[in-house]
Amino acid sequence: TKTNEFMDIRIENGIITKIAKDLTSETGEEILDLSGLTIAPGLIDTHVHFRDPGLTYKEDIHTGSLAAAKGGFTSVICMANTKPTVDSVDTLNDILNRAKVENIHIYQTASVSYGLNGEKMTDFDALADAGACGFTDDGIPLLNATFCYEAMQKAAALHMPISLHEEDKAFITNNGINAGETSAQLGVIAVSYTHLRAHET
């Protein structure tokens, strides 16, 4: 909203009913001094790992939801690199059904390829119809350019986003650092990054 102001907020039955400067308190209202705090619409995290199913000793849908809400995030997008991978409608439905009971909005991506192997494309149509919000082989680069381009075209035809984790691991000995002054000072082999964009003209 491009609005940063000091305001009073009235909340009734858990709903914000009024925002204005210098509201007059009503009889019986509880008044909280929130000086120094920021009130904003719910935040959205577009890249979370709830590790559910399969790796729930790290995180699960419920604990991830609680952590998100505690940090002010009311919507999250979960990555598809679970065990099993979110490459089938059954796995996607299981996650989305269990997510319904949580108090935040949980969206789930599906994988681009079966088993994150970068070889055979998942059924984008069926997964989109079942509620996938996008496609990603998160953490696994799609090194086959033809396969990657075909996946991008399919996602575009469905008006769905595709998220890529594109680095050639053969060039990277320490993930997360690009070639430059810092990598030279540290003596870390790194690689320059290139931003690739495919589009229709």
What are these regions (language model features)?
Residues 1-27, 200:
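N-terminal metal-binding scaffold of metallo-dependent hydrolase/deaminase domains
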Residues 62-86, 100-114, 128-143, 159-163, ...:
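Divalent metal-dependent hydrolysis catalytic cores, especially in the metallo-beta-lactamase
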Residues 194-201:
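Conserved small/polar residues in nucleotide/adenosyl-binding loops
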Residues 88, 170-183:
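Histidine/acidic-residue-rich catalytic or RNA/ligand-binding cores of hydrolases
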Residues 37-99:
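Metal-associated gating/positioning segment near the N- to mid-region
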Residues 24-39:
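Active-site metal-binding motif and surrounding structural segment of the metallo-beta-lactamase
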Residues 58-65, 117-125:
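Short, acidic/polar
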Residues 48-59, 109-118, 189-190:
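Active-site mouth loops of central-metabolism enzymes
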